[in-house]
Amino acid sequence: MKTTTYSLLALAAASKLASAHTTVQAVWINGEDQGLGNSADGYIRSPPSNSPVTDVTSTDMTCNVNGDQAASKTLSVKAGDVVTFEWHHSDRSDSDDIIASSHKGPVQVYMAPTAKGSNGNNWVKIAEDGYHKSSDEWATDILIANKGKHNITVPDVPAGNYLFRPEIIALHEGNREGGAQFYMECVQFKVTSDGSSELPSGVSIPGVYTATDPGILFDIYNSFDSYPIPGPDVWDGSSSGSSSGSSSAAAAATTSAAVAATTPATQAAVEVSSSAAAVVESTSSAAAATTEAAAPVVSSAAPVQQATSAVTSQAQAPTTFATSSKSSKTACKNKTKSKSKVAASSTEAVVAPAPTSSVVPAVSASASASAGGVAKMYERCGGINHTGPTTCESGSVCKKWNPYYYQCVASQ
């Protein structure tokens, strides 16, 4: 990875601002869309806005703001089911930019029994993906290329109610303490099969991270060869896991079998649009605290296998994390500071969407504003250089996050 590449791209993007935040908005089970999950009658414990959590000691780290409030519905799954999480910046439209391409970082998934997890306890990591040196890609690049979707496989756990917690850590301001941005939601599931793989004791959230952990206080703008994914190891009893190359073949077989049972065909050697270059912000202390930058991502194509779902045109096939091979390690114990866990593989099992474009467009703040002079929920409504609407739609107010970025959020 070249520092000069990032520097040149940073200069090109310095004047571009984009609302870059994201939330989980829907879930798929074995390729079947479960509908919008972040609504009043949904199944996702959703926050009032798509803004990140930055204080790793906050109770909002558990399930985000309002995460202690149960959702109306609970989805039913069984061991071996493939669950797909679908992230979006604004809405589920095909034009949605998912998250700003400048927001590089890992994607992880935790699970916990509902009662314990709601209190921040017994969280077990079942999947993770980080940085791939061979392709110079982050998990977030792959997520964007796959239209916000990534998979896990439900472990063979005892029947009961569980929370699944997908998480993104955006490191575009990770070069300063407190700059990393955490995005997460808790999705409510009922496991109907009665497996024998008891979850380990897990970790506490908050508590699992500190602001100075190597993978949280991390400068993506300087040269590096590896990235230590924060948090515990992936539980060796999970069916999802990390993207380590040593186990990608096993994951591919597991995922293919699970998806083939519910989808009619397999499309081989598809090309996935994936980011090969990052667009970053100025790394001065002032700009790092206030500026969010995004620009078009140059993509590179790689042949992978895709399990094609027979649902809707929106059912792009998501990233699948490979099965972890770290069975000799104690599950879900915090790693030491010196430990470097590298997610780098050219043989990663990725379930990817059919190619639609070689470029993933980033939406500028002004371009994303709604027509008619009124900004929609979560859109930009003010700040330095803003030329779009400054009035928010009914039910939302314009909140100042920093001098550069004001956003429409739900009225309190």
Curated annotation (Swiss-Prot):
O2 binds at H172. Its main location: secreted. Lignocellulose is the most abundant polymeric composite on Earth and is a recalcitrant but promising renewable substrate for industrial biotechnology applications. Together with cellobiose dehydrogenases (CDHs) an enzymatic system capable of oxidative cellulose cleavage is formed, which increases the efficiency of cellulases and put LPMOs at focus of biofuel research. Glycans are attached at N151, N334, N385. This is AA9 family lytic polysaccharide monooxygenase A. Its EC number is 1.14.99.56. Residues 373-409 form the CBM1 domain. It comes from Aspergillus niger (strain ATCC MYA-4892 / CBS 513.88 / FGSC A1513).
